[in-house]
């Protein structure tokens, strides 16, 4: 990380009033940050990204294809791993966002998130913040799935993949960590979904974030346990692969 970059941030939104509002939130609660704003990630320079420790991106204001926008951000996340990426996601973007943007350095918030939750996320930083807001996994967002009646019969490999997904890892990262191909990891994820009788990524993350999912996968970090992301945890995951 370049010297001083932790005090530089970027606000991205195609909606001018949202840009202004997010900048005002940062100015009020984090005066130590120097914030620039942009209507699009494509307009940012390499230097601006390299200097920044925080990006708040309003995806709810995007009018383009959700997948192409998320894929572009996925590419940026892969290149700039020191940045804490905070994405504000609308209901229609939820499925694409959890598939492509969930990772250890990103946080997904609802586009109707209370300001205090955004402030808490920024203050927590990219190693302590929750990976996904409870508002995004609430019944209103996930169309009410009742998982309590489902009997869980998952293989060890399937549990391992779902556990890492629940902790914010992407398919590529899991494949690299477990020394398996992307195809194998995707197959294990899909097999687990079939066993659980769930049919979409959004429903899968809803199960992972449910009380049953957290219990079955031993995932207290879903509710904010920062210790999951330290080096010791990574060593434990690798030793179990």
UniProtKB/Swiss-Prot annotation:
Gene source species: Escherichia coli (strain K12)
GO BP field: regulation of DNA-templated transcription; response to methylglyoxal
Top-level lineage group: Bacteria
Induction: Repressed by H-NS, activated by LeuO. Member of the yjjQ-bglJ operon.
Record bears the keyword Ubl conjugation: no
Assembly behavior: May form homodimers.
GO MF entry, a single one: DNA binding
Coiled-coil spans in chain: none
Protein name: Putative transcription factor YjjQ
């Amino acid at each position: 990380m370049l010297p001083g970059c932790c005090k530089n941030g970027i606000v991205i939104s195609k909606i001018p009033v949202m840009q202004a509002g997010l900048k005002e939130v940062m100015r009020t609660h984090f005066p130590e940050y120097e914030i620039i704003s942009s209507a699009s990630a494509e307009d940012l320079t390499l230097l601006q990204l390299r200097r920044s420790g925080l990006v708040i991106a309003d995806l709810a204001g995007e009018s383009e294809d959700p997948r192409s926008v998320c894929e572009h951000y996925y590419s940026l996340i892969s290149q700039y791993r020191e940045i804490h990426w905070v994405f504000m996601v609308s209901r229609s973007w939820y499925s694409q966002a959890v598939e492509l943007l969930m990772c250890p350095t990103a946080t997904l918030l609802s586009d109707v998130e209370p300001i205090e939750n955004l402030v808490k996320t920024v203050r927590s930083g990219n190693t302590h913040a929750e990976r996904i807001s409870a508002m995004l996994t609430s019944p209103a967002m996930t169309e009410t799935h009742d998982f309590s009646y489902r009997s869980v019969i998952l293989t060890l490999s399937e549990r391992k993949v779902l556990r890492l997904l629940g902790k914010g890892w992407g398919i590529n990262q899991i494949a690299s960590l477990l020394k398996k191909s992307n195809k194998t990891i995707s197959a294990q994820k899909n097999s687990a979904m079939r066993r659980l009788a769930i049919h979409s990524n959004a429903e899968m993350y809803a199960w992972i974030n449910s009380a049953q999912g957290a219990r079955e996968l031993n995932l207290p970090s879903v509710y904010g346990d920062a210790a999951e992301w330290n080096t010791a945890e990574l060593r434990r995951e690798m030793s179990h692969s």
